[in-house]
Regions:
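Short, hinge-like loop/turn segments at secondary-structure boundaries
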Residues: 91-93, 159-163, 219-223
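Conserved N-terminal segment of class I S-adenosyl-L-methionine
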Residues: 1-114, 123-129, 184, 205-209, ...
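Conserved class I S-adenosyl-L-methionine
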Residues: 143-167
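A C-terminal cap/extension of S-adenosyl-L-methionine-dependent methyltransferases
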Residues: 188-192, 202-254
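Acceptor-substrate binding/catalytic loop of class I
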Residues: 173-189
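A short glycine-rich, Lys/Arg-flanked "PGG" loop and its adjoining helix->strand segment in the class I
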Residues: 126-141
């Protein structure tokens, strides 16, 4: 995995945790909705004492919840700070490993890989999915999320590559940063890699809509409006590509 694809601030535990406490209701909702969906799927597809692999620990929000729910967690990351943050949790084993290579940690009942694939070099994307497949027992489940290539959030973030735009955004919003997303995939591209890795799709969902002016300056009414637009465009085949997160429940069949 490419450590350069992770900005310094994004490698900070507190930065990651603050995403779920953002005072802006739209930004907070984008992250919290994804967190809640992942936890719901992880809980529904595992039971007490199951072995759970988490690739990309971040601030430990999933690690903590799953360990508290009686799962035995193998926490894998390339960032030692993220692993140190969860090392003291009961029933959690930490591993400083590159998940684009075989993990060799035995079979797991469930794996979680949330908002990681976009940080992986494009030529290693398939290798990460192959590695996750190899870490699951036959019949095991992978809960996977990653941004959509043409999501409105990502289109706005690409403008931050231009320093004048980034400076203006920081002046208007108080903070702004490049996302470090180097492997953005369309649903078709991702589902091709999913199939090649040997997974079948048990469930899929897309969510999270962002328009800068409404999100940043319209407060709670703006957040409600954007949620309404999200619900309206979710069924539309092309337009739903503007939604931020593509989320999957995948099964290893063999």
């Amino acid at each position: 995995m490419n450590e350069q694809a992770i900005r310094p601030s994004q490698g900070d535990v507190e930065f990651q945790r603050r995403l779920y406490e953002d005072p802006n209701p739209t930004r907070r909702g984008l992250h919290s909705t994804r967190r809640d969906w992942v936890l719901d799927q992880a809980t529904a597809n595992s039971k007490v004492n199951d072995r759970v692999l988490e690739v990309g620990v971040g601030c430990g929000v999933f690690t903590e919840a799953l360990a508290a729910a009686g799962r035995r967690v193998s926490a894998v990351d390339i960032n030692p700070a993220f692993l140190d943050n969860v090392a003291a949790l009961e029933a959690v084993d930490i591993y400083l490993k590159d998940a684009t290579r075989p993990l060799e940690l035995g079979d797991h009942d469930l794996a979680i890989c949330s908002e990681v694939l976009e940080h992986v070099p494009p030529d290693r994307s398939q290798a990460m999915l192959d590695s996750l497949h190899g870490a699951l027992r036959p019949g095991g489940t992978l809960v996977l999320t990653t941004p959509q290539r043409f999501a409105s959030v990502e289109l706005v973030a690409r403008l931050f590559r231009f320093k004048p735009v980034l400076a203006l955004a920081r002046r208007l919003y108080g903070s702004a940063d490049e996302l470090g997303h180097i492997n953005l995939l369309t649903a078709g591209q991702l589902e091709g890699q999913i199939a090649k890795a040997g997974f079948t799709i048990a469930a899929r969902r897309r969510f999270g809509f962002y328009l800068p002016v409404i999100a940043e300056f319209a407060g709670k009414p703006g957040a409600a409006l954007l949620r309404g637009i999200e619900q309206a465009i979710r069924p539309l085949p092309i337009v739903r590509g503007l939604l931020w997160t593509q989320a999957y429940v995948l099964r290893r069949t063999a």
